[in-house]
């Protein structure tokens, strides 16, 4: 039930992002926030509070320091705000739901790439198709990017494979 709910509200939130938004400096140097962050966050919070009033909400702009509770929704309204603000496609809306202390469903929507990821106890899906990790026959064939600048990492990956 919660999985279908977060899929629906994230799809609805995507529709809010079809116009230009103002960009502001936030907190530390280089940290940005846009009107889109606030718009999507308010929209998602209102939907969650109406449907799940007893669940806590943790969100990057609204309540970032709240402790994760047994029953809560965790929101990043625009993950990749710098990319979003600069017109780059690597950004997304993220929502996860915890119930009875377990993360039971999550969504990552990347509208600019037309990618919609959903995961729950039955697996992970991209645009409705089940996905899984690729088998790595030997450790030296394994490639991982951890932390850092996603754009720089993607550029290196394209250049060097």
Where is each model-derived feature located?
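Short loop/turn microsegments at loop-to-beta-strand junctions
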Residues: 69-73, 93, 104
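Catalytic core of PPM/PP2C metal-dependent serine/threonine phosphatase domains
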Residues: 87-91
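N-terminal subdomain of lithium-sensitive/metallo-dependent phosphomonoesterases centered on the IMPase/IPPase/PAP
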Residues: 1-78
